[in-house]
Design a protein with these regions (language model features):
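Divalent metal-binding segments
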Residues: 3-10, 15, 19-298, 310-356, ...
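Short, well-ordered beta-strand micro-motif
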Residues: 28, 192, 306, 527, ...
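A short helix-to-beta-strand connector/capping loop
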Residues: 49-50, 270, 306-312, 388-391, ...
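Acidic (Asp/Glu)-rich catalytic clusters
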Residues: 264-268, 300-311, 384-387, 408-410
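Alpha-helical scaffolding within the catalytic cores
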Residues: 298-299, 402
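His/Asp/Glu-enriched, well-ordered alpha-helical/loop segment
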Residues: 357-370, 374-392, 396-398, 402-409, ...
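Short acidic, Gly/Pro-enriched loop/turn segments at secondary-structure junctions
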Residues: 403-404, 556-558
């Protein structure tokens, strides 16, 4: 029997993230797990001809990063449709469309990504030379016969609450049956019209999740299974390049996304450890008591659910109904979920929501939800069936006062936060909202740490690198003003790295198995482009992985 390690990394600064914050020089992996940490010369002496040896050459190593709210599947989907990035004018956009027409079959749909620069598609149409959106009449000049649809932004990429705009040419409107008599299905949608009352092809939606492409323009089609499969492959590559080795998908995962994960896993291609949460489609549930359904579902989502160290489904997403009619319309596209990847009808009215959460508590089904607005409902369920030790999850935590922090602590909730939104993109806006006297309530990382509440950092897919949230937790700088938002809530670099590693493992109820470089844990790590403990503060956001390893296998290596 071979006793030598499968992999040895030595001559580096290994930031172990163990309880003592140890910095080691080396480690060894065998059969997918760390078998030794420290003592580089002795480890090298144990190597044989089959051992992979990585000379770190002084570089920093961290445990594989764990994204606490990743929406991993979306990243690769951005490449399904042609990009309009770099288009600075309507003429630039028309040139792109014209080129697509030349390579398309007559009458074939031409569907593109939104106008603007990914990932946020910010400052449009002000960023175009004409300071306006193109219309059907513009698009008709280069595509009179092929239907054209420019997709809207997924609102959570931007978070500035400006309308989501999509644009169709005349042929697309004809196929969709949209004319001067068409009325928007909900008040949140505006069908822009010209002076004669005809639609201009421009749709504006005052919402964060598009409705038009799932209703009025459903004829454009959507992501296929192959799109999702290829997109997931590409997403994994992108996230690995930043050192991420695990994701937690707490917003819920619909069957069409789960199918892509399962197929990659069955083929041995899934290299991202993926903890998924069940997304229920309540409109499809039989007319039986909710508790009865939860009893049935418990067999596969209770406790740690079903799966292995690479793919697992456990827990259920719960949320109170908001904008019920809008979500009903989105859900009418079932089983298609678009960018969401979760069911649009996974919300419930308050009384049924509490009933569902009580049934979850009694069946040991972990509840995952979003924002502080859910706290009264969680507390109502807790009064009926205690949840203190069940590690329910509260994601997207943003503004929290001391009383709310205490309530979260007392319920034993685990949290994740998206500093990309609450600090970087919207910090100054939140500061205006709450006032300087309450600044420390904005993503209060230091207070949460001091209260003993676990906080997992998350990207929400904008952008994909967890080093952006790490930097934002440390520096807390607003993108637009450069102001430091609530400086008293800054945390140390080591604390932020813990939020991006071991606290993410705690979120997935797997801290005994991953999240730090310790003997017996899964052999996941990333060799970094610079040392996160000593690089210039503003360089934290630009850190990347030079090598990423999952279970002792290299899954990413920087090529140039």
């Amino acid at each position: 029997m071979r006793l030598a390690p499968d992999l040895i990394a030595h001559n580096g600064r290994v930031i172990t993230i163990d309880a003592s914050a140890r910095i080691a020089d080396a480690f060894a992996i065998k059969d997918g797990r760390f078998i030794a940490v420290g003592g580089g010369p002795a480890l090298l002496a144990a190597a044989d001809a089959q051992t992979t040896i990585i000379d770190l050459k002084g570089r920093a190593v961290v445990p594989g990063l764990i994204d606490g709210h990743a929406h991993l599947d979306r990243e690769g989907l951005r490449e399904v449709y042609p990009s309009l990035a770099g288009a600075a004018s309507i003429d630039d956009i028309l040139q792109r469309i014209e080129a697509l027409v030349r390579t398309s079959k007559p009458g074939a749909w031409i569907v593109t990504m939104p106008i603007g620069e990914p990932p946020s598609y910010w400052n449009m149409p002000a960023g175009l030379a004409e300071k306006r959106w193109p219309t059907r009449y513009d698009l008709d000049k280069v595509s009179p016969n092929n239907p054209v649809f420019i997709r809207p932004v997924w609102g959570f990429w931007r978070h500035d609450f400006s309308p989501l705009v999509s644009i169709a040419n005349t042929r697309a409107l004809e196929i969709a049956g949209i004319d001067r008599n068409t009325e928007p299905p909900v008040p949140a949608i505006t069908i822009e019209r010209d002076a004669s009352g005809e639609p201009t092809g421009v749709f504006a939606e005052r919402t964060l999740q598009p409705i038009v492409e799932l209703t009025l323009m459903r004829c454009i089609g959507g992501f296929t299974h192959e799109d999702r499969l290829q997109g997931l492959r590409r997403s994994i590559e992108v996230y690995h390049a930043t050192g991420t080795t695990s994701v937690y998908e707490g917003h819920g995962v619909a069957p069409e996304v789960l199918a892509a994960y399962q197929q990659l896993h069955a083929r041995g291609e899934l290299t991202m450890r993926s903890d998924l949460v069940f997304s229920p489609s309540w409109s499809l549930v039989p007319d039986v008591p909710i508790a009865t359904m939860l009893d049935r579902w418990a067999g596969w989502i209770a406790g740690r659910g079903l799966g292995d160290d690479m793919l697992r489904m456990a827990g259920m997403f719960c949320e109170v109904t908001a904008n019920a009619e809008e979500n009903r319309l989105r859900a009418s596209a079932h089983p298609y979920t678009g960018w969401a990847g979760f069911h649009y009808d996974q919300q419930l009215p308050p009384d049924r929501l509490i009933e569902a959460m009580v049934a979850c508590a009694r069946n040991d089904i972990r509840v995952v939800t979003l924002t502080m607005e859910m706290m009264p409902h969680i507390e109502a369920a807790n009064r009926i069936e205690p949840i203190r030790d069940k590690r329910w999850v509260l994601s997207h935590i943003g503004i929290m006062n001391d009383d709310q922090i205490a309530r979260v602590r007392d319920l034993g909730l685990v949290t994740s936060t998206n500093s990309n939104r609450y600090i970087y993109r919207s910090g100054s806006n939140f500061l205006k909202q709450v006032g300087e006297a309450r600044a420390d309530e904005i993503m209060p990382m230091a207070k949460l740490r001091d209260a003993g509440i676990k906080v997992s950092l998350a990207t929400d897919n904008v952008p994909t690198s967890l080093f952006h949230p790490v930097w934002q937790a440390v520096a807390r700088k607003d993108r637009d003003t450069g102001a430091v938002i609530a400086p008293e809530q800054r945390v140390s670099r080591m604390d932020a790295l813990r939020n991006a590693t071991i606290d993410g493992a705690y979120l997935s109820m797997n801290e005994a198995n991953k999240g730090s470089i310790e003997v017996g844990k899964l052999g996941d790590f990333a060799v970094l482009s610079a040392d996160p403990l000593s690089c210039a503060e503003d360089d934290l956001k630009d850190l990347s992985a030079e090598i990423t390893v999952v279970g002792g296998h290299v899954v990413y290596r920087q090529t140039a």
